[in-house]
């Protein structure tokens, strides 16, 4: 027993030491990666000349021009309405960001929002030398910008394939958060293919790498030391890092940069549809086994989809053999196609599968807005089953809204219509997968709606169409 007691502490110490070594062995060592990659990561500063706000002096407030600089800054921060610069002079706005060199002759990738509207762009290298950069082109839709500095034999990063990234894989960022050059942070890939509301054409890489203002435009590396993304956005309620960072995949950035280098702009494929997500109730309503695909809520007249035979209510399941798992997958795939290219789609229509061929168009510079419905005249019908009163669309409204049919909600009573959020002025174009061309059709379809089953309704509100679902109780 004495021998056992004396051995036990030694065994425990050995076990703890072994666990410590195992933990250390499982954590990556980033030192070699950082030493190799850092020289090609740059700090980007911009200057923009802006007219000073010229505000007339207000009673009880001093003129800032007559104050010492220290007091002037205090009043500017504390009292936004403080009059400043009555002479109308220009002031200089500055911003900081990051970037990385992709070619030895000086091409640099960064974010569009880092250099947007800049009058001067300065790139500072790791040796603290500064070079003036020329903006070759920028693409607001992907938030990618391509710069050029004069130089030869510049250090460059190695480019990797972001589509080979796996969730849970270690990644590392180098950038200039809050101006602190070449700060290194690490984390893991949290998710892939994230769609953000303001960016329909980028399937973002989500990470938990600490990203802060100033990191924008900097590289995201894998453990091989290859750039797999451009750090672009964070989700935050405080203005700082909260564990949700988003990077532009390198494949997207390279496609954009190649077009910017060749043409100074980006041309994307376009289908001419408005789509929405397919949830469980919509899947049941449209005869799908499970939620999948992109539901066509709107088809632009004479657009590529319209000419190819796509209809409102179709569910697009694949494009050129690539599955559409989420509706956000479709814009990414279509945007990557060249205008004039033929594309094959698998769609579900009225519960049956169909194949359609569409000639891809060119994405317009700006979206086309549809006018909202106004007051109406014509026949009036009420549906007690839905709790709604509808009236006919006028010819002028049909033309203005680019519609062939539909009815306008005049009054919403208690019932399913109120529960799903219908409002007066909404235009109902489809009910239970049937086109509504008149108030009589609406009343007939509403009367025949099934009970205890998801029913879809297509609604146009302020120019935007979407499908909503509801169930009628027994």
Swiss-Prot record:
Residues 260-351, 357-463 form the PDZ domain. The active site is at residues 113, 143, 216. GO terms for biological process: proteolysis. PROSITE patterns: PDZ (PS50106). It comes from the Bacteria. Its EC number is 3.4.21.107. Substrate binds at residues 214-216, 271-275. CDD domains: cpPDZ1_DegP-like. Keywords: Hydrolase, Periplasm, Protease, Repeat, Serine protease, Signal, Stress response. It catalyses: Acts on substrates that are at least partially unfolded. The cleavage site P1 residue is normally between a pair of hydrophobic residues, such as Val-|-Val. Its main location: periplasm. One of its GO terms (molecular function) is serine-type endopeptidase activity. It is an enzyme of class 3 (hydrolase). It holds the Pfam family Trypsin_2. NCBIfam families: degP_htrA_DO. Belongs to the peptidase S1C family. This is Probable periplasmic serine endoprotease DegP-like. It comes from Ectopseudomonas mendocina (strain ymp) (Pseudomonas mendocina).
């Amino acid at each position: 027993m004495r021998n056992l007691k004396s051995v036990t502490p030694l065994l425990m110490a050995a076990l703890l030491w072994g666990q410590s070594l195992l933990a250390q062995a499982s954590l990556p060592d980033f030192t070699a990666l950082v030493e190799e990659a850092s020289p090609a990561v740059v700090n980007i500063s911009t200057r923009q000349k802006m007219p000073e706000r010229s505000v007339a002096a207000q009673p009880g407030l001093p003129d800032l021009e007559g104050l010492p600089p220290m007091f002037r800054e205090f009043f500017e921060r504390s009292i936004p309405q403080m009059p400043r610069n009555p002479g109308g002079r220009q002031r200089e706005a500055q911003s900081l960001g990051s970037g990385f060199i992709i070619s030895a002759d000086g091409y640099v990738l960064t974010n569009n929002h880092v250099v947007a509207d800049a009058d001067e762009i300065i790139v500072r290298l790791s040796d603290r030398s500064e070079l003036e950069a020329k903006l070759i082109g920028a693409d607001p839709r992907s938030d990618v910008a391509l710069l050029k500095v004069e130089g030869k034999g510049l250090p460059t990063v190695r480019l990797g394939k972001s589509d080979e990234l796996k969730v849970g894989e270690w990644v590392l960022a180098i950038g200039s958060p809050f101006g602190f050059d070449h700060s290194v942070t690490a984390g893991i890939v949290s998710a892939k293919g994230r769609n953000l509301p303001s960016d329909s054409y980028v399937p973002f890489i989500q990470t938990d790498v600490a990203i802060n203002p100033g990191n924008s435009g900097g590289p995201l590396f894998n453990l091989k030391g290859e750039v797999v993304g451009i750090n672009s956005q964070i989700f935050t309620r405080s203005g700082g890092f909260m564990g949700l960072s988003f990077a532009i995949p390198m494949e997207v950035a390279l496609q954009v940069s190649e077009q910017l280098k060749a043409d100074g702009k980006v041309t994307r494929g376009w289908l001419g549809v408005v789509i929405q997500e397919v949830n469980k109730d919509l899947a049941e309503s449209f005869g799908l086994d499970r939620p999948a695909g992109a539901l066509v809520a709107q088809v632009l007249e004479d657009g590529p989809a319209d000419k190819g035979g796509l209809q409102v209510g179709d569910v697009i399941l694949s494009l050129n053999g690539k599955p559409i798992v989420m509706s956000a997958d479709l814009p990414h795939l279509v945007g990557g196609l060249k205008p004039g290219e033929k594309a094959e789609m698998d769609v579900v229509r009225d519960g049956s599968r169909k194949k359609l061929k569409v000639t891809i168009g060119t994405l317009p510079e700006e979206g086309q807005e549809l006018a909202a419905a106004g007051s109406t005249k014509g026949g009036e019908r009420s549906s007690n089953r839905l709790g709604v009163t509808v009236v006919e669309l006028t010819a002028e409204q049909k033309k203005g809204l680019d519609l062939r049919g539909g009815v306008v909600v005049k009054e919403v009573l208690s019932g399913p219509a109120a529960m799903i959020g219908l409002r007066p002025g909404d235009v109902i174009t489809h009910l239970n997968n049937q086109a509504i061309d008149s108030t009589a059709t609406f009343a007939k379809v509403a009367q025949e709606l099934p009970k205890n089953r998801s029913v879809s309704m297509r609604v146009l509100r302020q120019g935007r169409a979407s499908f909503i679902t509801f169930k009628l109780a027994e």
